[in-house]
Amino acid sequence: MTEETVQPLIEFKNVSLDYGETKVLKKVDLEIEEGKFYTLLGPSGSGKSTILSLISGRLQPTGGDILIEGKNVNSLPSNQRKVNTVFQNYALFPNMNVYDNVAFGPSIKGFSKKKIDQLVKSMLKLVKLDDFSDREISEISGGQQQRVAIARALANQPKVLLLDEPLSALDYKLRKEMQSELRELQQRLGITFIFVTHDQEEALAMSDWIFVINDGKVEQSGSPVDIYDEPINHFVANFIGEANIVPGVMKEDYLVSFAGKDFKNVDAGMRTNERVEVVIRPEDLDIVVPSRGKLQVTIEDQSFRGDSYEITAIDDAGNEWAVQATNPAKIGQRRGLKFDPEDIHIMRLNESEEDFDARLESYEGED
Ligand SMILES: Nc1ncnc2c1ncn2[C@@H]1O[C@H](COP(=O)(O)OP(=O)(O)OP(=O)(O)O)[C@@H](O)[C@H]1O
């Protein structure tokens, strides 16, 4: 039986964008399905907003193809795409009240007054601003402005909502609140959200699927859990959460050597004695008495994080380990580090997802 393939809502095939000599996007492939929450996560300048501009039609690619519902839209104007964007600065009309801001899109489309009214009221209800219709934009808070911007975009009834760092102007608490509100809104509406952020915590908390973008390329894509637990390379491991990354050698299947010792692990399929990078997350390390530790360390530093202590320890081979611990430690003390085989994650050196797959295929072909 063949599995039915779902046509992606949006596809990027080998999409490049150059500004003269500057290559901003380098042969990007993406697939976006209907009804999910996607996040483009990457550092400043990596090309996230450029990808949104290509989806919305504000920019055209210099190479490759962009497809929406299977049709090439490389040169389809923005206003003919069922896509709307919520910008970082909200871009609200300051001279209009809340109601008129939301009514703007539907009025341009020539809908009847009654239909516009219904639409605006339901959108304002959706973002919990039904009592704020008559307020001027200057009379509402940042978080409320953010909601108006979302209601305004949704009033255009898009298939896809693009959100370009929409929470970055909010304070920590409001930002957290809006994260769950946005997530809930997306689930309720069932439309596709593509959210841009450089905040990994935000991406992990909100998304069904994350694209990690770096230097105009997709470094890795996957569910938040996949990306956190199985980062494909040094960049992703470092960018997504805190990671201890030390050099190692895969001696054989399920046996890795690092910090001068051999450890059982759960990875297989690499060459004998292949050089690798070993990743262990700070929360997967426990500080114990030296005799119970798999590695012996000296406590170098510690800082209080509110709900935990971040401890820095140095092993006898000179590797530095960040440990997230519930109890404080004493600087200068000799301790042990404990971890389980499944907490050891192995990364091949400088390997892209494509190279990794190609190598895996050739490995499987050798049987
Ligand atoms: N008109 C332009 N000419 C030349 N380079 C440009 C132009 N517009 C953008 N760039 C470059 O393209 C790169 C990607 O920009 P983009 O805005 O997509 O990044 P980003 O990941 O969204 O960053 P941020 O998180 O800071 O918004 C940047 O290095 C930027 O300097």
Swiss-Prot record:
<dbReference type="GO" id="GO:0015417">
    <property type="term" value="F:ABC-type polyamine transporter activity"/>
</dbReference>
<dbReference type="Pfam" id="PF08402">
    <property type="entry name" value="TOBE_2"/>
</dbReference>
<comment type="subunit">
    <text>The complex is composed of two ATP-binding proteins (PotA), two transmembrane proteins (PotB and PotC) and a solute-binding protein (PotD).</text>
</comment>
<dbReference type="InterPro" id="IPR017871">
    <property type="entry name" value="ABC_transporter-like_CS"/>
</dbReference>
<keyword id="KW-0472">Membrane</keyword>
<dbReference type="InterPro" id="IPR008995">
    <property type="entry name" value="Mo/tungstate-bd_C_term_dom"/>
</dbReference>
<dbReference type="InterPro" id="IPR027417">
    <property type="entry name" value="P-loop_NTPase"/>
</dbReference>
<dbReference type="InterPro" id="IPR013611">
    <property type="entry name" value="Transp-assoc_OB_typ2"/>
</dbReference>
<protein>
    <recommendedName>
        <fullName>Spermidine/putrescine import ATP-binding protein PotA</fullName>
        <ecNumber>7.6.2.11</ecNumber>
    </recommendedName>
</protein>
<feature type="domain" description="ABC transporter">
    <location>
        <begin position="10"/>
        <end position="240"/>
    </location>
</feature>
<dbReference type="GO" id="GO:0016887">
    <property type="term" value="F:ATP hydrolysis activity"/>
</dbReference>
<comment type="similarity">
    <text>Belongs to the ABC transporter superfamily. Spermidine/putrescine importer (TC 3.A.1.11.1) family.</text>
</comment>
<dbReference type="InterPro" id="IPR050093">
    <property type="entry name" value="ABC_SmlMolc_Importer"/>
</dbReference>
<keyword id="KW-0067">ATP-binding</keyword>
<dbReference type="InterPro" id="IPR003593">
    <property type="entry name" value="AAA+_ATPase"/>
</dbReference>
<keyword id="KW-0547">Nucleotide-binding</keyword>
<keyword id="KW-0813">Transport</keyword>
<comment type="function">
    <text>Part of the ABC transporter complex PotABCD involved in spermidine/putrescine import. Responsible for energy coupling to the transport system.</text>
</comment>
<dbReference type="GO" id="GO:0043190">
    <property type="term" value="C:ATP-binding cassette (ABC) transporter complex"/>
</dbReference>
<feature type="binding site">
    <location>
        <begin position="42"/>
        <end position="49"/>
    </location>
    <ligand>
        <name>ATP</name>
    </ligand>
</feature>
<dbReference type="InterPro" id="IPR003439">
    <property type="entry name" value="ABC_transporter-like_ATP-bd"/>
</dbReference>
<dbReference type="GO" id="GO:0005524">
    <property type="term" value="F:ATP binding"/>
</dbReference>
<dbReference type="Pfam" id="PF00005">
    <property type="entry name" value="ABC_tran"/>
</dbReference>
<keyword id="KW-1278">Translocase</keyword>
<keyword id="KW-1003">Cell membrane</keyword>
